[in-house]
UniProtKB/Swiss-Prot annotation:
Corpora cardiaca. Its main location: secreted. It is found in: Secreted. This is Pyrokinin-1. Belongs to the pyrokinin family. One of its GO terms (biological process) is neuropeptide signaling pathway. GO terms for cellular component: extracellular region. Signal peptide: none annotated. Keywords: Amidation, Neuropeptide, Secreted.
Length: 9
């Protein structure tokens, strides 16, 4: 899940 900084699941 992208919290707005790093694109991660």
């Amino acid at each position: 899940h992208t919290a707005g900084f790093i694109p991660r699941l």
